[in-house]
Amino acid sequence: MRKMLADGGISGVEVASCGTKYYGDLEREEVMCRIAAEHGYEMGGKAVTMTEELLNSADIIIVMTEYQHDEVTRLLTYSHWDRIVRFNEYCFGEPTDLPDPHYQTEHVYRTCFDTIERGCREIVRKLGA
C-alpha cells in the first residue's frame, strides 16, 4: 500500500497493518514475503499487535473479515465504529470476507495477494480522486 501511494504521488496517508490474533512479535510468513517480493513489494519486519491506541487514532480501519470486524469493536471506542469497513466491500462493493490465507497453500496466498493488490489500487484511486 505504501509503495502504491508513493507511486501515485499521494502523501499524508499513514498506513498501519496489524493482526487481530497475534500478540507480541511474530515473524511474517515466508510465503507471503516471497510472493510480495515477486511483485516488487517489501514485507519485512514483524506483525504488529492491534492496540486500542492504534485503532482509535485511525481515520479508517479496513478489515478482511467479519470476525476481524468484531475483534476491532472490542478495542475501538464505540463512537468510532463507523470507521470500520470490510476490504471487499470498500474496494469492490462486495459485502464478503477476504479469506485468511495464513497456513494454507501457496495457491491460496497467491489468490489472496491478487485480490489485495487490486483492492489497494482501488483505495489509491479513491484517495487520489
Question: Can you annotate each of these PLM segments?
Answer:
Residues 1-58, 125-129:
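Conserved active-site segments centered on acidic
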